[in-house]
From Swiss-Prot:
The gene is ndhC. Keywords: Chloroplast, Membrane, NAD, NADP, Plastid, Plastoquinone, Quinone, Thylakoid, Translocase, Transmembrane, Transmembrane helix, Transport. It is found in: Plastid, Chloroplast thylakoid membrane. This is NAD(P)H-quinone oxidoreductase subunit 3, chloroplastic. It comes from Staurastrum punctulatum (Green alga). It catalyses: a plastoquinone + NADH + (n+1) H(+)(in) = a plastoquinol + NAD(+) + n H(+)(out); a plastoquinone + NADPH + (n+1) H(+)(in) = a plastoquinol + NADP(+) + n H(+)(out).
Length: 121
């Protein structure tokens, strides 16, 4: 039995997944009005005031640490929600797996807390 027919649906979905962005960008380029190459239109303009000085500002690393911790726990929520919706069907094994997952995340949170990543001062 050839292996190729087994993956027909995969290749079809892969082709569709590649064609949708290409078609969306092509249609957007065809339908969108032409833009002028005026350099004034590419300048920074906010709240009716022309910017003064350099626009590059260095952010403190604390912002990135908070963002990283937020992303970690946001991803945790994304993984836990489908599990919670099908909790009755999955059984005790899935509960043990999720418990290990949450324990690993709690250990990571304690590590970040002890390293001072969550302190603002």
């Amino acid at each position: 039995m050839p292996i190729l027919p087994k993956y027909e649906s995969f290749w079809a979905f892969l082709l569709i997944a590649c064609l949708i962005p290409v078609l969306a960008i092509s249609v957007s380029n065809l339908v969108a009005p032409s833009t002028s190459k005026n350099p004034e239109k590419s300048t920074t303009y906010e709240s009716g005031i022309e910017p003064m000085g350099e626009s590059w500002i260095q952010f403190q690393i604390r912002y990135y640490m908070f963002a990283l911790v937020f992303v970690i726990f946001d991803v945790e929520t994304v993984f836990l929600y489908p599990w919670a919706m099908s909790f009755d069907d999955l059984g005790i094994i899935a509960f043990a797996e999720v418990l290990v997952f949450v324990i690993i995340l709690i250990i990571g949170l304690i590590y970040a807390w002890r390293k001072g990543a969550l302190e603002w001062s």
